[in-house]
Amino acid sequence: MAKHLFTSESVSEGHPDKIADQISDAVLDAILEQDPKARVACETYVKTGMVLVGGEITTSAWVDIEEITRRTVRDIGYVNSEMGFDANSCAVLSAIGKQSPDINQGVDRRDPLEQGAGDQGLMFGYATNETDVLMPAPVTYAHRLVQRQSEVRKSGSLPWLRPDAKSQVTFLYDDGKIAGIDAVVLSTQHSEEISQKDLHEAVMEEIIKPVLPAEWLSANTKYFINPTGRFVIGGPMGDCGLTGRKIIVDTYGGAARHGGGAFSGKDPSKVDRSAAYAARYVAKNIVAAGLADRCEIQVSYAIGVAEPTSIMIETFGTEKVSTEQLTLLVREFFDLRPYGLIQMLDLLHPIYQETAAYGHFGREHFPWEKTDKAAQLREAAGL
């Protein structure tokens, strides 16, 4: 393979779409804390001065959606109108209904193992050995840049930083291996008084250099820091935000295929979310076991049916055993029925708000990031 470039982006917790994702998942967590069997599909819309929370929720729990919303926005950092959004004064509207009984009858079963999928759909999982967290490098470092922006902002060391930010990193590959970083884009919302010269210098020294490995940077690396020259108006004042609008940021940065289903605001009976987590778990364990350098898995479901309708594995010519054998190993060691994967990954807990910014994958404390099946897979494969 010749040299090629590959780019991924990320956005901060203060990006409008990510505000919406975090509110949806904060509502989900609050409900799961009281009622682990709740059915939740929570969507959020944010715009200047208002938040609208809607969806279908069936639960025995009671939660204060307005308080959850304000607390989430406050924790992100939108606490005065100068930033374009204020947790204390924004309107919070709620339009919540119940899950359709037509869907419910296909999901709930007397035998939990026969729990049906909450919808039809296809989901992908992916892993690669190019980083220590078995994730593609471009999206990994794009996330780390905006995470660093948030840390610096919240520490107060750069008081002119504001919550809304975006990053983008272009990697150069040579024969499939990382050869360096070709370009870095970082745009951050800021207060009126900071000069562009001071902003450029501070972003480079306090955000970019501490995050990106020096060995991948060179005199040829291009830097684009607030390339429009001004980013004072941001957050929901600059753009409206919606739950589920950053599905590539949430997953693999475009390095793997995506089934189209968003994650945030959905309880684990929704295979859009839970099966995508399980697919990552499978792919990561295959790579951790040394059975392939790269692995992409597709699973699909029919609404109301427990067993997946298909399982497909792609290893891009890096497999150490046949993909047919890998598929048999997956069926043997991983239960990909909805109830099975919920139990396998212990998903009925309030763990979701943290997933809603900086990527659902590649952060080791989430249960789908465990590599506890790797040794078994390797032994069963005869390696």
From Swiss-Prot:
Residues that coordinate or bind Mg(2+): D17
Keyword Metal-binding annotated: yes
Names of the cofactor(s): Mg(2+); K(+)
E.C. no: 2.5.1.6
Catalyses which reaction(s): L-methionine + ATP + H2O = S-adenosyl-L-methionine + phosphate + diphosphate
Role this protein plays: Catalyzes the formation of S-adenosylmethionine (AdoMet) from methionine and ATP. The overall synthetic reaction is composed of two sequential steps, AdoMet formation and the subsequent tripolyphosphate hydrolysis which occurs prior to release of AdoMet from the enzyme.
Protein name: S-adenosylmethionine synthase
Taxonomic classification: Bacteria, Pseudomonadati, Pseudomonadota, Gammaproteobacteria, Enterobacterales
Gene behind the chain: metK
